[in-house]
From Swiss-Prot:
It is a single-pass membrane protein; Single-pass type I membrane protein. SMART domains: IG. The keyword Repeat applies. Predominantly expressed in testis and placenta as well as in many cell lines, including epithelial cell lines. This is Nectin-3. The keyword Transmembrane applies. Cis- and trans-homodimer. Can form trans-heterodimers with NECTIN1, NECTIN2, PVR, IGSF4B/Necl-1 and with IGSF4. Interaction between NECTIN1 and NECTIN3 on the pre- and postsynaptic sites, respectively, initiates the formation of puncta adherentia junctions between axons and dendrites. Interacts (via Cytoplasmic domain) with AFDN, providing a connection with the actin cytoskeleton. Binds with low affinity to TIGIT. (Microbial infection) Interacts with C.difficile toxin TcdB, suggesting that it may contribute to TcdB toxin entry into cells. It was however shown that NECTIN3/PVRL3 does not act as a major receptor for TcdB. GO terms for biological process: cochlea morphogenesis; establishment of protein localization to plasma membrane; fertilization; heterophilic cell-cell adhesion via plasma membrane cell adhesion molecules; homophilic cell adhesion via plasma membrane adhesion molecules; lens morphogenesis in camera-type eye; protein localization to cell junction; regulation of postsynapse assembly. Residues 426-549 are cytoplasmic. It is found in: Cell membrane; Postsynaptic cell membrane; Cell junction, Adherens junction. CDD domains: IgC1_2_Nectin-3-4_like, IgV_1_Nectin-3_like, TM_EGFR-like. GO terms for cellular component: adherens junction; apical junction complex; axon; cell-cell contact zone; cell-cell junction; dendrite; hippocampal mossy fiber to CA3 synapse; plasma membrane.
Length: 549
């Protein structure tokens, strides 16, 4: 009985599965089968197409893209899933239009590694269905396209490709800036972070928020690059001991690289003198002054001195402390200066020391105990008991009495002066005020005013601007301008007219010895009738007999 050959056309979607020409040639040597019916001839290509596609569609599984790190190892995965017999598996690398065999696994002859890959390529296991290899010590030349190929019988070859990208892990370092950080100086490079020969170029960032970064990048022919980042700041002594951190990020790194740097700010000494509590008195012992200095670099010299240039006995300078060996006396009063020096300069501080009188102490007199005498039972001899009384108390009481007397005298004198001043002010204010009261009697208007309001009509007595006393003294004829014939003149119809705007114009009597338009009348006109006038603070004189609105 003859075998039926299954032809091998290419399957859609299975472009990476190929059949060798030798299998087709071998198939042509077989006996021809009987001629099938016409319906079978039409269905045969479809059945054969379905058979091949089901057998070879996606038979090799690989990772399309693999990232390798220079100098390290990488695994290239290749799993073969076919039902046919696998006669050989191999790895090839594409170089342009040609390929180079990397490694071969034959079920009968074993493993074989070609050329430059010897000693660097190993198959993961001995199974023909797993062609995964490990490539050791990755170099730049290992990047490119690799093909995993499987040879089956009788269907031929099947293959899939993967692309290897070689990354170079950067070499990271952190160094101190070239210049020292001096307090108050210009902007200075504090630290330099370098990520050298990375592929691709690394990314550098800084943590610290004390300054700003400045980066430069240099590229090389092997596609690597070096980045240098400088951290700049304005130095200040308060930033001493602060931490800044360089953070390097790169795809070849499993995690970010972080390098920290402690700022070392140099500054001149900051000096302060302590130890004086303000209660140094004559006779006090065990006191000292201490010179505190904060400097970077540390100070190498401390010197004590006095502002007046004197140096009393009993002063001992040891390191940064000035000891007062002897009990204090008034000679130790003065201004003490401490000068501290380091490589950046000299600073000083001073302290004013005042030695006061010793505090008042109470000394008890020795007392004699009372001893009863038993020599004679009838006459008991005793000594008077002396009560303890401090000697200094009498002086204190005397001083307090004198001080009390002096304070009383001074206080009494001040009180008398104060009372005198207040009395003078009161009298002065009273003299400046008016001498009397306004005329406050109830005013009874004339009978004619009770009948009809004539508030806008001037009365005859209101036209007299001066009292009778003034008129009698002057003895001048009164020139009364208000005449009957004058009021009757037709051109003077505005006089005493209520509806006229000029109704308030009032004629005045004329006196020869007085000037018209005087604002005030002198006091000599009121000698005989002084009580009728009132003098005000502003200097004006008001008559009691007048009514004012």
């Amino acid at each position: 009985m003859a075998r039926t050959l299954r032809p091998s056309p290419l399957c859609p979607g299975g472009g990476k599965a190929q059949l060798s020409s030798a299998s087709l040639l071998g198939a042509g040597l077989l006996l021809q089968p009987p001629t099938p019916p016409p319906l079978l001839l039409l269905l045969f290509p479809l059945l054969l197409f379905s058979r091949l596609c089901g057998a070879l569609a996606g038979p090799i599984i690989v990772e399309p893209h693999v990232t390798a790190v220079w100098g390290k190892n990488v695994s290239l995965k290749c799993l073969i899933e076919v039902n046919e017999t696998i006669t050989q598996i191999s790895w090839e690398k594409i170089h342009g239009k040609s390929s180079q065999t990397v490694a071969v696994h034959h079920p009968q002859y074993g493993f074989s590694v070609q050329g430059e890959y010897q000693g660097r390529v190993l198959f993961k296991n001995y199974s023909l269905n797993d062609a995964t290899i490990t490539l050791h010590n990755i170099g730049f030349s290992d990047s490119g396209k690799y093909i995993c190929k499987a040879v089956t019988f009788p269907l031929g070859n099947a293959q899939s490709s993967t692309t290897v990208t070689v990354l170079v892990e950067p070499t990271v370092s952190l160094i101190k800036g070239p210049d020292s950080l001096i307090d108050g100086g210009n902007e200075t490079v504090a630290a330099i972070c370098i990520a050298a020969t990375g592929k691709p170029v690394a990314h550098i960032d800084w943590e610290g928020d004390l300054g700003e970064m400045e980066s430069t990048t240099t590229s090389f022919p092997n596609e690597t690059a070096t980045i240098i980042s400088q951290y700049k700041l304005f130095p200040t002594r308060f930033a001493r001991g602060r931490r800044i951190t360089c953070v390097v990020k790169h795809p070849a790194l499993e995690k970010d690289i972080r390098y920290s740097f402690i700022l070392d700010i140099q500054y001149a000494p900051e000096v302060s003198v302590t130890g004086y509590d303000g209660n140094w008195f004559v006779g006090r012992k065990g006191v000292n002054l201490k010179c505190n200095a904060d400097a970077n670099p540390p100070p190498f010299k401390s010197v004590w001195s006095r502002l007046d240039g004197q140096w009393p006995d009993g002063l001992l300078a040891s390191d940064n402390t000035l000891h007062f060996v002897h009990p204090l006396t008034f000679n130790y009063s003065g201004v003490y200066i401490c000068k501290v020096t380091n490589s950046l300069g000299q600073r000083s501080d001073q302290k004013v020391i005042y030695i006061s009188d010793p505090p008042t102490t109470t000394t008890l007199q020795p007392t004699i105990q009372w001893h009863p005498s038993t020599a004679d039972i009838e006459d008991l001899a005793t000594e008077p008991k002396k009560l303890p009384f401090p000697l200094s108390t009498l002086a204190t009481i005397k001083d307090d009495t004198i001080a009390t007397i002096i304070a009383s005298v001074v206080g009494g004198a001040l009180f008398i002066v104060l009372v005198s001043v207040l009395a003078g002010i009161f009298c002065y204010r009273r003299r400046r005020t008016f001498r009397g009261d306004y005329f406050a009697k109830n005013y009874i208007p004339p009978s004619d005013m009770q009948k009809e309001s004539q508030i806008d009509v001037l009365q005859q007595d209101e036209l007299d601007s001066y009292p009778d006393s003034v008129k009698k003294e002057n003895k001048n004829p009164v020139n009364n301008l208000i005449r009957k014939d004058y009021l009757e003149e037709p051109e003077k119809t505005q006089w005493n007219n209520v509806e006229n705007l000029n109704r308030f114009e009032r004629p005045m009597d004329y006196y020869e010895d007085l000037k018209m338009g005087m604002k005030f009348v002198s006091d000599e006109h009121y000698d005989e009738n002084e009580d009728d006038l009132v003098s005000h603070v502003d200097g004006s004189v008001i008559s009691r007999r007048e009514w004012y609105v």
